[in-house]
């Protein structure tokens, strides 16, 4: 596996290939990232991953400075998974000057849920993803990029951006990888204390219970069910931002009977100092 730190080096390594399969990450890799690499690899003629902790998607009070940087261990895992090129740029390489041109997702998708509780988050995500796509796919007739469904809203934001800009990139949404107790794998799980790690599995259980309740009748009172789910988590010591049932296609609240509507239950809540997100399609 080649490890490159500059855009010029990256493009040189990718020059012989026509269809990169790309997995962008912020590092501190877990089995979910590795599963994405393995899923994407057969869909391209070269497999690329990136590790870059993107300052633009962190608010001033968030964990940019403390986010784990584990490049050597990550590189070993990527190589073992069959990655051919790892792009690990320094901040000055991707942002040699202040990034004044930014991608602002449409408010109906970018300003709800995660976008509401983390203002500017999807602006930072969309901007860095488009920039990474430019680095990886420049001059290529097609490509594939893999993202995990754990970040469900992010997948929709990126997919819509690709459609809006007519980019020749297929977006692969990989299934969420989970621990044996149901906790969605996340780089931020490493922040949890031993007791918090045990409790953290309750988030996926709360989402499943909410989903089951929503599907129990054709016309449920979703607002009441969502409020009850949040109260139940709060009683366990969590600080929930949202637990909600939405349409899969656009993350808007469902209208009318739910029987035929493809839905997803999404949640975000803070346990101690760690904010966790998860979702379940129902």
Curated annotation (Swiss-Prot):
Chief subcellular location: cytoplasm
InterPro entries, per database record: Pantoate_ligase, Pantoate_ligase_C, Rossmann-like_a/b/a_fold
EC id: 6.3.2.1
GO biological process, one term: pantothenate biosynthetic process
SUPFAM superfamilies (alphabetical): Nucleotidylyl transferase
Chain residues that bind (R)-pantoate: 57, 154
Residues at the catalytic site: 33 (proton donor)
Compartment annotation: Cytoplasm
Binding residue positions for ATP: 26-33, 148-151, 185-188
Binding site for beta-alanine: 57
Domain of life: Bacteria
Pfam families: Pantoate_ligase (PF02569)
GO cellular component: cytosol
CDD domains, per the entry: PanC
Catalytic activity: (R)-pantoate + beta-alanine + ATP = (R)-pantothenate + AMP + diphosphate + H(+)
Pathway: Cofactor biosynthesis; (R)-pantothenate biosynthesis; (R)-pantothenate from (R)-pantoate and beta-alanine: step 1/1
Keywords: ATP-binding, Cytoplasm, Ligase, Nucleotide-binding, Pantothenate biosynthesis
Note: The reaction proceeds by a bi uni uni bi ping pong mechanism.
Main function: Catalyzes the condensation of pantoate with beta-alanine in an ATP-dependent reaction via a pantoyl-adenylate intermediate.
Subunit structure: Homodimer.
Family: Belongs to the pantothenate synthetase family.
Matching NCBIfam families: panC
Protein name: Pantothenate synthetase
Organism, as annotated: Polaromonas sp. (strain JS666 / ATCC BAA-500)
């Amino acid at each position: 596996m080649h490890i490159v730190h500059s855009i010029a080096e990256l493009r040189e390594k990718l020059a012989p290939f026509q269809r990169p399969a790309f997995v962008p990450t912020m590092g501190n890799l877990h089995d979910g990232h590795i599963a994405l690499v393995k899923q994407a690899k057969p869909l391209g003629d070269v497999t690329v991953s990136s590790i870059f902790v993107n300052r633009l998607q962190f608010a001033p009070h968030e964990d940019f400075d403390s986010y784990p940087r584990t490049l050597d261990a990550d590189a070993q895992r990527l190589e073992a998974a069959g990655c051919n090129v790892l792009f690990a740029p320094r901040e000055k390489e991707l942002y040699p000057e202040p990034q004044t041109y930014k991608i602002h997702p449409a408010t109906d998708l970018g300003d709800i849920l995660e976008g509401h509780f983390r203002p500017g988050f999807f602006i930072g995500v969309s901007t860095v993803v488009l920039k990474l796509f430019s680095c990886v796919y420049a001059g290529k007739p097609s490509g594939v990029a893999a993202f995990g469904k754990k970040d469900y809203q992010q997948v929709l934001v990126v997919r819509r951006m690709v459609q809006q800009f007519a980019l020749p990139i297929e977006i692969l949404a990989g299934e969420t990888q989970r621990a044996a107790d149901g906790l969605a794998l996340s780089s931020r799980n490493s922040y949890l204390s031993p007791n918090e790690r045990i409790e953290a599995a309750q988030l996926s259980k709360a989402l499943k219970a909410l989903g089951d309740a929503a599907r129990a009748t054709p016309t449920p009172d979703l607002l009441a069910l969502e409020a009850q789910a949040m109260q139940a988590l709060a009683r366990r010591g969590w600080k929930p931002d949202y637990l909600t049932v939405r349409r899969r296609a656009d993350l808007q609240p469902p209208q009318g009977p739910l029987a035929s509507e493809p839905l997803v239950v999404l949640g975000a809540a803070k346990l101690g100092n760690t904010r966790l997100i998860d979702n379940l399609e129902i």
